[in-house]
């Protein structure tokens, strides 16, 4: 599963997930993409589950790019522990998703296969998504 090799600090503030994605909002590596329409957090496990579903459907035909990385640690206190005594330990990693962010890209397959594969992958994700393709001018 994806997670940073090392970070400057072990824990992060919760923060707020506002605005829309301006960077990473266009299909830039592949031919087709899966773009987030809603906002939320995608865990490293969900990202991997969706990747497996997509790659299982395209088999050896296409190439897949993951355009997001879970770089935010989410901490959690153990079960049945009283409040206080500091912040809990990092439990898992998430990527914050804003509307417009391209999550996955694919090339080397037909549009029909790409749509089916991304539909299978999107079912594993907690955000609403849309299928997009690269617009070629001319």
Curated annotation (Swiss-Prot):
GO biological process: translation
UniProt-listed Pfam families: Ribosomal_L16
Xref: NCBIfam families: rplP_bact (TIGR01164)
Native source organism of the sequence: Acidithiobacillus ferrooxidans (strain ATCC 23270 / DSM 14882 / CIP 104768 / NCIMB 8455) (Ferrobacillus ferrooxidans (strain ATCC 23270))
Molecular function per GO: rRNA binding; structural constituent of ribosome; tRNA binding
GO CC annotation terms, alphabetical: cytosolic large ribosomal subunit
Highest rank taxon of the organism: Bacteria
Protein name: Large ribosomal subunit protein uL16
Function: Binds 23S rRNA and is also seen to make contacts with the A and possibly P site tRNAs.
Matching PANTHER family: 50S/60S RIBOSOMAL PROTEIN L16, LARGE RIBOSOMAL SUBUNIT PROTEIN UL16M
InterPro entries the record matches: Ribosomal_uL16 (IPR047873), Ribosomal_uL16_bact-type (IPR000114), Ribosomal_uL16_CS (IPR020798), Ribosomal_uL16_dom (IPR016180), Ribosomal_uL16_sf (IPR036920)
Region spans: Disordered: 1-22
Keywords on record: Ribonucleoprotein, Ribosomal protein, RNA-binding, rRNA-binding, tRNA-binding
Basic residues: bias regions: 1-17
Protein family (similarity comment): Belongs to the universal ribosomal protein uL16 family.
Subunit comment: Part of the 50S ribosomal subunit.
């Amino acid at each position: 599963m994806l997670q940073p090799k090392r970070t400057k600090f072990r824990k992060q503030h919760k923060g707020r997930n506002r605005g829309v994605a301006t960077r990473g909002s266009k299909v830039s590596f592949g031919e087709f993409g899966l773009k987030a329409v809603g906002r939320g957090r995608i865990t490293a496990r969900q990202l991997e589950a969706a990747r497996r579903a997509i790659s299982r459907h395209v088999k050896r035909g296409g190439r897949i790019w993951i355009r997001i990385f879970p770089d935010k640690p989410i901490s959690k206190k153990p079960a049945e522990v009283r409040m206080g005594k500091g912040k809990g330990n990092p439990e898992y990693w998430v990527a914050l998703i804003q509307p417009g962010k391209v999550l996955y890209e694919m090339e080397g397959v037909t549009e029909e296969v790409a749509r089916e594969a991304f539909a299978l992958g999107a079912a594993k994700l907690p955000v609403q998504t849309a299928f997009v393709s690269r617009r070629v001018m001319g």
